[in-house]
């Protein structure tokens, strides 16, 4: 049986897995943080807006705008990270294709090569999926904050 993973490749995959596990925990914590920061803003509009609550409403509107800007910056940052990871994947795919086409001594079809390559890049793809899930969460949170702004605007009328 041919060994398809040398020690260097196993170490590379393990390092990415550890990074992904930390990234997943980081994103879970950030989701919880965003949720706890945003929820109180929605509590402000649960009651009718009157003169007493008006300053809280204006403050909530201001905070929501600030959060949306923060979210947009985070989205850009993580989309850039995703882009860099996609470049890494293309390089690994190329290297592994050459390995399976020329170096391993196995006769494989293109589909079989792709299956073998997919196993090598699974953790890289997990990294991209984690980033995409977090970016989607941020986009959803931003839309909710935008809707909050419209709700406040309509209630003030």
Give the location of each predicted region.
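Long amphipathic alpha-helical coiled-coil segments
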Residues: 79, 83-91, 125-157
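Extended, charged low-complexity scaffolding/tethering segments
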Residues: 1-52
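Sequence-level detector for tyrosine residue identity
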Residues: 5, 13, 26, 54, ...
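Prokaryotic Sec-type signal peptides and long signal-anchor helices
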Residues: 30-31, 46, 71, 81, ...
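Extended, amphipathic alpha-helical coiled-coil scaffold segments used for oligomerization/tethering
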Residues: 51-58, 83-129
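Short, charge-rich amphipathic alpha-helices with coiled-coil/heptad character
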Residues: 38-72
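Long, heptad-repeat alpha-helical coiled-coil rods/stalks that form the central scaffolding/linker segments
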Residues: 61-64, 68, 75, 103, ...
């Amino acid at each position: 049986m041919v060994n398809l993973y040398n020690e260097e490749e196993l170490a590379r995959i393990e390092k990415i897995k550890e990074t992904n596990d930390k990234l997943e925990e980081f994103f879970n914590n950030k989701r919880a943080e965003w949720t706890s920061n945003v929820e109180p803003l929605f509590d402000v509009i649960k009651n009718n807006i009157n003169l007493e609550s008006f300053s809280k409403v204006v403050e909530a509107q201001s905070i929501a705008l600030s959060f949306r800007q923060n979210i947009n910056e985070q989205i850009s940052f993580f989309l850039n990270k995703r882009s860099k990871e996609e470049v890494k994947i293309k390089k690994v795919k190329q290297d592994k294709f050459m390995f399976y086409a020329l170096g391993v001594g196995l006769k494989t079809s293109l589909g079989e090569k792709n299956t073998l390559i997919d196993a090598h890049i699974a953790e890289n793809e997990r990294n991209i999926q984690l980033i995409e899930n977090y970016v989607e969460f941020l986009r959803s949170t931003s839309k909710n904050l935008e809707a909050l702004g419209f709700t406040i605007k309509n209630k003030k009328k």
